[in-house]
Amino acid sequence: MSVPDRKRALEAAIAYIEKQFGAGSIMSLGKHSSAHEISTIKTGALSLDLALGIGGVPKGRIVEIFGPESSGKTTLATHIVANAQKMGGVAAYIDAEHALDPNYAALIGANINDLMISQPDCGEDALSIAELLARSGAVDVIVIDSVAALVPKSELEGEIGDVHVGLQARMMSQALRKLTATLARTNTCAIFINQIREKIGVSFGNPETTTGGRALKFYSSIRIDIRRIGSIKGGENFDIGNRIKVKVAKNKLAPPFRTAEFDILFNEGISSAGCIIDLAVEKNIIDKKGSWFNYQDRKLGQGREAVREELKRNKELFHELERRIYESVQASQVPAAACVDAESREVAEAAK
């Protein structure tokens, strides 16, 4: 078949598909504008936003946050909810664990008056509510907390001790098949918080696994492994927070396996000032000599906590350092997008 014949055959096939399934059911990827644009919601930790490679968690996708107990999973998810609301978006929280503290959520910055919350009785109800909210197209982010607490209805109606092999995994697999397409169509981000379990009898390799089967691992565009690696001491040697390390275990939108560290303080959640300090020191924007931190010709303070308080007071300095960090990151990245012609989408010769 010649090239003109192949082109005519393809055009006829496209015309039949659009007649059968509707206009827009098939199109060129380059002409599909939304394919090039990834809307994101900031996580509240600048170091994590940079590690994700796209500036936050993506809308229209599934994100899984997993880790051990008291590692900051709910705090991170609540910060994402708060940032979505600050952007003018609508957020929903499906609290299957019945453990969301509205006072802590408000302290972090979430608007609890506008935050929709559901505490369903069983897993099927929780996932159906999530799917209906996503289908409405009016919700920007949905948090499901947590996968381990999504109890199938038949298990709920049975006796304690009854064996239900693979019941939750089948429920998750069935729900995610429907949910994935709905999220992409309505540009809604679904965040699943998950717990970890130990595999019995594993001698080699990582014995840890997450609940709910393998479906969530496959359908997630981003998987965030969050761990507590230490405590932060305040006055009189009391703990005032935790040091957190995050690994991007899966990323379909940027290079995976990047890591980030940040502080979670008990009275404010993720410390944005702490992230600025860490990144500014790492990129030699702030000069650290001993316990003193200096910026240009100015002494910011002695000790990390003193500098943190200075940045919380001086918002102008905070935003200046944030801007310089972004400039440093952009300068260090390979400008691949700059080498692509905007109209022809062809790779151009790199500017010398």
Curated annotation (Swiss-Prot):
<keyword id="KW-0238">DNA-binding</keyword>
<dbReference type="GO" id="GO:0006310">
    <property type="term" value="P:DNA recombination"/>
</dbReference>
<dbReference type="GO" id="GO:0003684">
    <property type="term" value="F:damaged DNA binding"/>
</dbReference>
<keyword id="KW-0547">Nucleotide-binding</keyword>
<protein>
    <recommendedName>
        <fullName>Protein RecA</fullName>
    </recommendedName>
</protein>
<dbReference type="GO" id="GO:0140664">
    <property type="term" value="F:ATP-dependent DNA damage sensor activity"/>
</dbReference>
<dbReference type="InterPro" id="IPR049261">
    <property type="entry name" value="RecA-like_C"/>
</dbReference>
<dbReference type="GO" id="GO:0005737">
    <property type="term" value="C:cytoplasm"/>
</dbReference>
<keyword id="KW-0067">ATP-binding</keyword>
<dbReference type="GO" id="GO:0005524">
    <property type="term" value="F:ATP binding"/>
</dbReference>
<dbReference type="InterPro" id="IPR020588">
    <property type="entry name" value="RecA_ATP-bd"/>
</dbReference>
<dbReference type="InterPro" id="IPR020587">
    <property type="entry name" value="RecA_monomer-monomer_interface"/>
</dbReference>
<keyword id="KW-0233">DNA recombination</keyword>
<dbReference type="Pfam" id="PF21096">
    <property type="entry name" value="RecA_C"/>
</dbReference>
<dbReference type="Pfam" id="PF00154">
    <property type="entry name" value="RecA"/>
</dbReference>
<comment type="similarity">
    <text>Belongs to the RecA family.</text>
</comment>
<comment type="function">
    <text>Can catalyze the hydrolysis of ATP in the presence of single-stranded DNA, the ATP-dependent uptake of single-stranded DNA by duplex DNA, and the ATP-dependent hybridization of homologous single-stranded DNAs. It interacts with LexA causing its activation and leading to its autocatalytic cleavage.</text>
</comment>
<keyword id="KW-0963">Cytoplasm</keyword>
<dbReference type="GO" id="GO:0003697">
    <property type="term" value="F:single-stranded DNA binding"/>
</dbReference>
<dbReference type="GO" id="GO:0016887">
    <property type="term" value="F:ATP hydrolysis activity"/>
</dbReference>
<dbReference type="InterPro" id="IPR027417">
    <property type="entry name" value="P-loop_NTPase"/>
</dbReference>
<keyword id="KW-0742">SOS response</keyword>
<keyword id="KW-0227">DNA damage</keyword>
<keyword id="KW-0234">DNA repair</keyword>
<dbReference type="InterPro" id="IPR023400">
    <property type="entry name" value="RecA_C_sf"/>
</dbReference>
<dbReference type="GO" id="GO:0009432">
    <property type="term" value="P:SOS response"/>
</dbReference>
<feature type="binding site">
    <location>
        <begin position="67"/>
        <end position="74"/>
    </location>
    <ligand>
        <name>ATP</name>
    </ligand>
</feature>
<dbReference type="InterPro" id="IPR049428">
    <property type="entry name" value="RecA-like_N"/>
</dbReference>
<dbReference type="InterPro" id="IPR003593">
    <property type="entry name" value="AAA+_ATPase"/>
</dbReference>
<dbReference type="GO" id="GO:0006281">
    <property type="term" value="P:DNA repair"/>
</dbReference>
<dbReference type="InterPro" id="IPR020584">
    <property type="entry name" value="DNA_recomb/repair_RecA_CS"/>
</dbReference>
<dbReference type="InterPro" id="IPR013765">
    <property type="entry name" value="DNA_recomb/repair_RecA"/>
</dbReference>
